[in-house]
Regions:
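Intrinsically disordered, low-complexity regions of eukaryotic proteins
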Residues: 3-4, 22, 40, 50, ...
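Beta-strand-rich receptor-binding modules of extracellular spikes/adhesins
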Residues: 1-28, 135-136
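N-terminal cationic leader/targeting segments used for protein routing and processing
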Residues: 8, 23, 35, 42, ...
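N-terminal compositionally biased, intrinsically disordered segments and leader/signal-like regions
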Residues: 14-15, 27, 40-43, 61, ...
């Protein structure tokens, strides 16, 4: 049987979400991943993948993303990384984070610069980071 969650005066008049017998979900509108905003990041930072899908981090010092324990296989999203007014903050990665060619991630260093890094969780303890998009203005 299908599960239909509707909006309106009668069930199903405007389907908002339906899940069929094969567990295929269909949304009647845009599904928006939650954004976690943290404006003071320095030192070791562990992302909470159960609390949010996307992360906005302002670096106030050098940051190491430590290995999380909350990631879900198949989860994807992005990191928005903002340098503070000083800039030149660096990013180091725990072993669960994997970057293209294993080279790590190089961010923009100018004060107040904004970079975007996509990610997808490939498997337990394996978070694939995409190539950063640098220096948004």
């Amino acid at each position: 049987d299908d599960l239909v969650i509707g909006k309106g005066s009668a069930l199903g008049t405007t389907p908002a979400l339906s899940i069929d017998e094969n567990l295929v979900s269909t949304f009647g509108a845009t599904a928006i991943g939650k954004l976690s905003t943290d404006t003071t990041n320095t030192g070791n930072v562990e992302l909470d993948f159960t609390a949010a899908q996307n992360f906005l981090l302002t670096f106030t010092g050098n940051v190491t993303l430590t290995n999380p324990s909350t990631e879900n296989v198949g989860q994807s999203g992005f990191l928005i990384i903002i340098q503070d007014g000083t800039g030149s903050r660096t990013l180091s990665l725990g072993t669960d984070y994997e970057s293209p060619s294993g080279a790590g991630i190089t961010l923009s260093t100018a004060a107040n610069s904004v970079d975007v890094v996509p990610y997808v969780v490939k498997a337990a303890n394996s978070i694939q980071l995409g190539t950063p998009q640098l220096a948004f203005s």
